[in-house]
Amino acid sequence: MIPVRGFEGKTVAVFGLGRTGLTAARALIAGGAKVALWDEKPESRQAAVAEGLNVVDLTTSDWSDYAALMLSPGVPLTHPKPHWTVGKAKAAGVEVLGDIELFARTVNAAPEHKKPKIIAITGTNGKSTTTALIGHLCRQAGRDTRVGGNIGEGVLGLEDMHGGAVYVLELSSYQLDLTSSLKPDAVVLLNISPDHLDRHGGMDGYIAAKRRIFLNQGKGDTAIIGVDDPWCQQICTEITAANRRTIWPISAGKAMGRGVYALQGVLYDATGERVTEMADLLRARSLPGRHNWQNAAAAYAAAKAIGIPAHQAVDGLMSFPGLAHRMETVGKLGKVRFVNDSKATNADAARQAMSSYPKFYWIAGGVPKAGGIDDLVDLFPRVAGAYLIGQAAEDFGKTLEGKAPARQCGDIETAVAAAYADAVASGEEAVVLLSPACASFDQFADFEQRGEAFRAAVNGLGKPAAKRA
């Protein structure tokens, strides 16, 4: 745990008692603060009381008693409308912050010899894979590495800092909205496409949240920016003009005079005086597809930015084992391979997986995002069959009509069985791809549970029907 500094003897209100909120409360107490915890779910309050934490009804308490409000990232700060705790905090002149901000202030207050290296990663898609990949590269190079934030452990639950440590942090737009003091040694902005627009008041607000990750960088720091979409390209241009830090653009599709890029699966380093071919990513263990080439370019650049030798970074790329639910092969029956890409919760993420196969049997659906799958129409000729589930099934069927064969399946078990039957009937090598292009909350707790349901359905195909039931 990282004890939070700066609130010794003061009381911090904490709203939202999930993983982030409880971890922050413990870290605040460890640093000498007092806490007042609240959650609208009675079971969450009861769990906090059982742990011996101080639960206070923030709807009726005196907010002038609080030095700050620690808001969990899932709670709206501004849109669709500010949460009631935000209103009470602002009315009382109480600052609102998140766990990443608490971490940042603690780092900033530490003596120079105790300050760790920080690599911060954001973007619409690929954050978790890139974060895990950078963590793997750092560990393989012998660095004392802690990976967390929006992936795995909450940042304040990670092991306490020292001067030789490296913190590799995935940051969501929600977390960045609540952060103002973080100063990463290396920042990775992978890509931007429309997502979470209801929480940011539109595309401009979403881009502004992502851009906050660069707020405090200066001389000696490195900004690593994907330039394969227009929004990130614009940010790269503007930040380069500011001329305050090292800028390394990254791309998975175009050669550049400076930065790191991949062409046809070959990774090139153009951060020095000449362009050097570094690795054949087609031979990497778990980095299939163009989107993963961008992730690899980002990870290589981030490792180099904190002083890891190029050959060690390349070794890490080649040995990376991959992450569950991100283009994860979960089984093969005969000629049919099953790929779990449950993390694809929007169309742009699904595009990355769909672009990796010339033909596939596609399981899609759930809670749709704005625009549905309209932007994927250019990939429909690759769809040998679509098997639709969840709330989006009917609308997706209409979008696919006349463009690709589609079937209403309702649930994931039915979809897997139908896709497998059609794939076998083709007599060819085939891929059944779960890449839903939707959130999961209509049928599952989260994308992980959806991915595990897919895995279970695939495993069930190899068993007699009576046992599957």
Curated annotation (Swiss-Prot):
Residues involved in ATP binding: G123, T124, N125, G126, K127, S128, T129
Enzyme Commission number(s): 6.3.2.9
Pathway: Cell wall biogenesis; peptidoglycan biosynthesis
Enzyme class per UniProt: ligase
Domain of life: Bacteria
Major subcellular site: cytoplasm
Cleavable signal peptide: none
Gene3D superfamilies: Mur ligase, C-terminal domain, Mur-like, catalytic domain, NAD(P)-binding Rossmann-like Domain
Subcellular location: Cytoplasm
Disulfide bridge positions per record: none
Key words of the record: ATP-binding, Cell cycle, Cell division, Cell shape, Cell wall biogenesis/degradation, Cytoplasm, Ligase, Nucleotide-binding, Peptidoglycan synthesis
GO-annotated cellular components: cytoplasm
Gene Ontology annotations of biological process type: cell division; cell wall organization; peptidoglycan biosynthetic process; regulation of cell shape
GO molecular function: ATP binding; UDP-N-acetylmuramoylalanine-D-glutamate ligase activity
Reactions performed catalytically: UDP-N-acetyl-alpha-D-muramoyl-L-alanine + D-glutamate + ATP = UDP-N-acetyl-alpha-D-muramoyl-L-alanyl-D-glutamate + ADP + phosphate + H(+)
Family note: Belongs to the MurCDEF family.
NCBIfam families associated with the record: murD (TIGR01087)
Function: Cell wall formation. Catalyzes the addition of glutamate to the nucleotide precursor UDP-N-acetylmuramoyl-L-alanine (UMA).
PANTHER family registered for this protein in UniProt: UDP-N-ACETYLMURAMOYLALANINE--D-GLUTAMATE LIGASE (PTHR43692:SF1)
UniProt-recorded name of the protein: UDP-N-acetylmuramoylalanine--D-glutamate ligase
